[in-house]
Amino acid sequence: MSRLSRVFFDSPKNHKVFIPFITAGDSGLDNTFELMQVLVKNGADVIELGVPFSDPMADGPVISRSYERTVKDGVSLSDVFTVVKKFRQTNNTTAIVLMGYLNPIEVFGYQPFANAASESGVDGVLVVDMPPEEAYGLKQILDGVGINFIFLVAPTTMDERLVFLATIASGFIYFVSLKGVTGAEYLDINLVKTHILRIRQVIDLPIGVGFGIKDAISAKIVSEYADAVIVGSSLVGLVERYANDRTKMLAKVGYLANEISTIIK
């Protein structure tokens, strides 16, 4: 069983998995490492690291700005692996998922990417702009090094595609709770419930819900139906807001993470 799968398997029935997202290299690589430590101390079961990219089309303004900062600072995919490897020196239980876009992986090369990800301690990969129908080659390579391949499901995803995803996805399904980009405002819990039930009829994987979860209240509501709660824009916004005061940044991120993880477990 993979480390990512074990996170869900070992989680008590009524305790939901908490998956915070931060952008790797935002405010510095050392800062990312410290943020990862703070998130774990405050209840993170899985950490999603955003891989810097110049054209993050699926992301809203908060996360897009974080990518702009990291691209400007020259943060590379190799830098992301370095941070994960450092994290693994003291933590062998928290799962790490890389979330990003296809171009940096293609430039790196599928097999070198998979090898470097595995060697650093990455557990899962989510490629936002890679259609499942075109993902089989990368899936085979990731399977070969024991890395889960995670896919997005949107409210607009057709049943036929769900059937196909059941044959290719692993780790968990990332359900996009809103039509739009990350950080969007309105969360329709009835829509979330309906689509989670629809996904469960076809795909036998845990379901994490992201987009639109901003605080402990929205996290609690979503956790009634999902297996995992994914929070990104609110945390990345704190990193941006307190970029000039690392102590306060770490405290604010830790407080929000603790508030969310406590209420869903």
Swiss-Prot record:
Give the residues annotated as active site: 48, 59
Sorted keywords for this record are: Amino-acid biosynthesis, Aromatic amino acid biosynthesis, Lyase, Tryptophan biosynthesis
Q: Which InterPro entries match?
A: Aldolase_TIM (IPR013785), RibuloseP-bd_barrel (IPR011060), Trp_synthase_alpha_AS (IPR018204), Trp_synthase_suA (IPR002028)
What pathway annotation does it carry? Amino-acid biosynthesis; L-tryptophan biosynthesis; L-tryptophan from chorismate: step 5/5
The answer on whether this UniProt entry bears the keyword Cytoplasm reads no
Q: What is its EC number?
A: 4.2.1.20
Annotated Pfam families: Trp_syntA (PF00290)
Q: Which CDD domains match?
A: Tryptophan_synthase_alpha
Q: Which GO terms describe its cellular component?
A: cytosol
Give the molecular function GO annotations. Answer: tryptophan synthase activity
Q: Where are the transmembrane segments?
A: none
Which interval of the chain is the signal sequence? none
Quaternary form? Tetramer of two alpha and two beta chains.
Q: Which HAMAP family match?
A: Trp_synth_alpha
What biological function has been recorded for the protein in this entry? The alpha subunit is responsible for the aldol cleavage of indoleglycerol phosphate to indole and glyceraldehyde 3-phosphate.
Q: What family does the Swiss-Prot or TrEMBL record give for this protein?
A: Belongs to the TrpA family.
This one is known as Tryptophan synthase alpha chain
Lineage, please?
Bacteria, Pseudomonadati, Pseudomonadota, Gammaproteobacteria, Candidatus Pseudothioglobaceae
